[in-house]
């Protein structure tokens, strides 16, 4: 493995402040290098962080190349310019090229500590498998959703998102910060083991594959007219079958899941997703058997 530099990003969304605090503990000279690998720790969206908001003009994590934001607002939105800067500075062909990007996020949903992957890149599978094997973390595999594109880690040859919640926006939670610190330390250790061929992959990777998203009930004006059903609150990753309640509207009517397939919900009630008209996303569970090629692909970095 020839990885020489790894990018650790916090504050991609400016009001997700816990990973920024955790990263400060690592962004010191003694932590910059580990066994020949240089770690770059940056705040993804510093202006939004200063203002305590998610973004200035557009979601930075939807503003990299191949996104609608990038195509339509290349020269006018702060976030698209920031995305270009990050790629020019830290992209594989940048002035400080990084082979791997790790993007740290929090959520107001009860997701626990989880991994988010975008697509089925073998290098990403390799890194995610090691973390899942060590901590038992659930994996949300997001793919084939044309409404959501341009994610940060997709701009690097290898990368994943660490998502931790539930925690309110702009609220420091020591337990959440400790979880980020543990994950960052473990990632550094696992990458070091990979570099020295001291690792064995688990036999399989369990993923929850994105299938779609569900909006809140709405009235004729388009305003939200229902709440997440009490039985569904804080039940991320818990299976839903036909007939299970999803929402309770203003008339007291229960809106039930009417699909025939079993689904597993994620990001239930995520505050930031209201503007995207998403009350929750739903997934199907899939088991992917590990392949030696994953390690070979990772070693090629």
Swiss-Prot record:
InterPro entries: AspA/AstE_fam (IPR050178), Aspartoacylase (IPR016708), AstE_AspA_cat (IPR055438), Aste_AspA_hybrid_dom (IPR007036)
Cofactor comment: Binds 1 zinc ion per subunit.
Catalytic reactions of this protein: an N-acyl-L-aspartate + H2O = a carboxylate + L-aspartate
GO cellular component terms listed in the entry, alphabetical order: cytosol
Cofactor(s) in the UniProt record: Zn(2+)
Principal EC category: hydrolase
SUPFAM superfamilies in alphabetical order: Zn-dependent exopeptidases
EC code(s) of this entry: 3.5.1.15
Record-listed substrate binding positions: 54, 61-62, 163, 273
Lineage top rank: taxon: Bacteria
Signal peptide bounds: none
GO molecular function: aspartoacylase activity; hydrolase activity, acting on ester bonds; zinc ion binding
Positions that bind Zn(2+): 13, 16, 105
Keywords tagged on the record: Hydrolase, Metal-binding, Zinc
UniProt xrefs under HAMAP family: Aspartoacylase
The family this protein is said to belong to: Belongs to the AspA/AstE family. Aspartoacylase subfamily.
Protein's recorded name: Probable aspartoacylase
Lineage: Bacteria, Bacillati, Cyanobacteriota, Cyanophyceae, Synechococcales
